[in-house]
Amino acid sequence: IATFDADMIPQHTFLMKTVPYFLLSRFAKENGKWRLKKEEEVDKKFRLGLIQTPQSFYNPDLFQFNLYAEGNIPNEQDFFSREVNTMRNTSNAIAYTGSNTVILREAMEEIGGFPLKTITEDFETSLRIQKAGFITYATDEIQAAGLTTTTIKSMIRQRVRWARGIIQSLQNTHAIATPRLPLLARLTYLNTFLYWWSFFNRLIFVMSPILFALFDYRIVNSHFWDVIVFWLPAYFFYSMSMRYLSSNVRNQRWSQIIDTIFMPYLIVPVLLETFHIHQRKFKVTNKKKEGKGIGFEFAVFAIPHVILLALSAAAMIRFVHGKYGWALFYSSIILFWIIHNMVSLFYAIFFMLGRPAYRNSERIRAEEDITIQYKALTYEARTADVSENGLAFWSEKPIYLPENKTVEFVITTSHYKARLEGKIVYVKEQDKGWRYSAAIRAVDEENKRQYMQIIYDRTHSLPMQMDLWVTAYDDMLRNIKKRLKQPFKDKRKMPRIPMERQITFTNGAACRLVDFNYCYFSVSDFNTNGSQDDTFIYNTESGIPLVLKRTGIYIRHSSEELLSVVNLDDLTGKNIINQILVDIKNTDEKEG
């Protein structure tokens, strides 16, 4: 039985990467080849009940998006899916996360189907399968991807459901105490339970220096050197263990930031659920994209963090007031503690501020062969990224594709082929080439299906590991700059190609060609040679006649005039429009 969330899209290799696990007990590998075991060789005790592949998402999660970190950190859920869950294989205590999974029907029948008295039926299903004596296994190879939640409200609601549901399931199955699970599995589930109480620990960690520095309330009675001896080694080894165990998917700083963000909203639900005050209603996570940025969510959800930040600032000011020399030195532990917490609180406030979303569909990096056609013109290029409503491709040379005209695109991969049509919406010079962006749609339903497969039948292009060179200072500076920067929409739909050469027209008039974009020439130092005409003809090296007309439009402080290409449609129909660039470039080289 394969299960997927409604928004999850499996890759074409999903079944081939998961189903063979269920056959391992019946096959043996000898001399590099697999053979079917004899009946007496089969281990009857080996019963694989579930294979869990990682949860993966093709859109940035809120930590990546709201903090402008989609190029620096992986999805927040990657740490559990690709690191924690796979490590739980050793204790046979992996968590079924509800999607991207294959379950043995026999195992489902033995436990009586999905449990109903919990709001995390997926987690409890894997727990009951393990209690029934089956092996469960988590892999680290991504085989499906979907949408992660895009609003703070829905993310918090999702985490509350996970917290309450997991505690419900642990209570329903007595997982921590049952003798039907091995000791390692029970310890793993004890750790699972304690994790949800870590948010209460986080609150104590944030409030302790505030209570001491601002209200003179002492949480722990210790001397400066006692703290150094006990705290500093613990801090160091915790940081090292996070770095060693997480494979650069998560570090201590980001763990504390994430816990600080969720802290105010998980303490009460965890407390209620622990004392059997249950939530029974399953609330579906909203994944509809919203692009409002700062608004209601900030005003509501940032309040606890703003209060804690204000208290921390007040505590720091009061604590350092009047201290000098050794007194200030011995106060450094408390100051470091407060500042350390304030950094996480600043992250939380930036997170709650949100960020405007300008795209309706996610853009996924994909390098595939693409053929572009317009009338008699045909070009070969490579896609840069694709989305449901648009695509971008990269060309080594600037090519002519008319503005506001329908262009045909054919994308070909090793498995799919899609014919699309659309219009160029943006062109810019990039990476020693030219990037073209287009708004597109499929020509029919079959091509739409093929195009959807091209987009989603791939591993997403978001980071899989952290950029360890990015510090908290870098994050803060980036957030401030991005939030102060006014959005600018470049509307250029044709390539502007610099020329800088002198040309002479057939009537003796001359000018300096500054640049052109196939539709217009920008010229300076125009000498009409006494002609009163506003139309001029220039013959290129190949003898192509360019009929240019003065528009009366001046740019760049009136130092340059625009000349329109009158016979553009004729040049396009004869498929010689691109030869113009070649001729002018060749002339440049000869003159050089």
Feature locations, PLM:
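Catalytic donor-sugar/metal-binding loop of nucleotide-sugar-dependent glycosyltransferases
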Residues: 128-144
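Short, solvent-exposed secondary-structure boundary/capping segments
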Residues: 390-395, 428-442, 520-525, 556-569
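Short conserved beta-strand and strand-loop elements enriched in small hydrophobics
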Residues: 366-375, 402-419, 465-466, 497-508, ...
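Long helical/loop segments within the catalytic core of UDP-sugar-dependent glycosyltransferases
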Residues: 12-119, 131, 152-191
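Membrane-embedded multi-pass helical conduit in multi-pass membrane proteins
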Residues: 195-280, 296-355
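Acidic donor-binding loop at a coil-to-helix junction in glycosyltransferase catalytic cores
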Residues: 119-125
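Short beta-strand-to-loop acidic/aromatic patch adjacent to the donor-nucleotide binding site
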Residues: 1-9
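N-terminal helix initiation/capping motif
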Residues: 334-386, 397-398, 456-518, 528, ...
